[in-house]
Amino acid sequence: MDGELRAQGLRKRYGPKEVVRGVDLALRRGEIVALFGPNGAGKTTTFYMVVGFIRPTGGRIYLKGQEITALPMYKRARLGLGYLPQEPSAFRRMTALENLLAVLEFQPLSKKERLEKAKALLEELSIYHLRDRMAYSLSGGERRRLEI
């Protein structure tokens, strides 16, 4: 499967303890996937390796056919692979538009381009009508879409 996200033989070792041993994943765009297992089974560690929080001890990770195993998290994000934490990550005292503009500050765009991109994202996420609302006043679902 060359379509989306693939991990082959992921391994992670902390000292003598191997916490992830030979995990393979193959995910297509739009799929909803869950990792199940007891505490300490390596679910979070596997996820962190895929998104780039930590480097695997072994194995490879591919996104759309391109190997990304050694890429830092921010470069993976530019390729479309991101992480949405369980905890709220929107700035509560900023508007929906201001939240997106703050994130776009890190992109090599002009002020005008950032504004256009932010407005396009608000449209894409179906929350353009909420652009001037403070993040704390959004519903849970609206806030999650903003955080995406």
Model region roles, listed by residue range:
Residues 15, 71, 98-113, 124:
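ABC-type ATPase nucleotide-binding domains, specifically the catalytic core motifs of the NBD
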Residues 36-38:
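The feature captures the beta-strand-to-loop junction immediately N-terminal to the Walker
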Residues 51:
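Helix-to-loop junction immediately C-terminal to a conserved catalytic motif
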Residues 66, 112-130:
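Conserved ABC ATPase "signature" region
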Residues 134-138, 142:
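Conserved ABC ATPase signature
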